[in-house]
């Protein structure tokens, strides 16, 4: 049985960005909703393990990698939402630049998120340099790893509203894309 690490971004100590409506941080939002992805993956026949970097003893991305590695996952997916200047919005997925399987999974999940949220498709973001977001998470995971940024929920009102309104469908779509990734087989 294939195992998927569903890593909640940030930590209880550092919640990450806060939604424009101030209801949730990244950590609290995904803590409330990640179970929907887990349930759908399990319904599809996968083992899904919800985890967080704080369980590996820290709050930085390297601890997220350590926790995903400890789970023994075949795929690691870390859940976030974005923030930037108020004019920027959309959906993007980050992956390790040298991982063909990571890129394949990223393509499938990015397409699924865009289909549900109907926000601008900001595309895939290959992570290669130490200055890139999540560098140590990607560098240190031993399996294909992704970081999902489905919306600019901390800086764009439309993105925030859309993420909240469609989170259930989004969770099902992400699980479906993961299923498609495994069914198509690794590169």
Report the location of each language-model feature.
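Catalytic-core regions of hydrolytic enzymes
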Residues: 2-91, 95-101
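Active-site-adjacent substrate-binding region
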Residues: 101-128
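Short, charged, low-complexity patches
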Residues: 30, 102, 106, 163-171
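Conserved SGNH/GDSL esterase-like catalytic core that processes O-acyl groups on lipids
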Residues: 46, 61, 122, 126-132
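Short glycine-/small-residue-rich flexible loop motifs, especially phosphate/cofactor-binding loops
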Residues: 38, 65, 111, 135, ...
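Sec-exported extracytoplasmic/periplasmic mature domains
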Residues: 35-46, 69-73, 110-118, 175, ...
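Active-site-adjacent mobile loop/cap segments within catalytic or ligand-binding domains
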Residues: 5-7, 11, 16-18, 23-24, ...
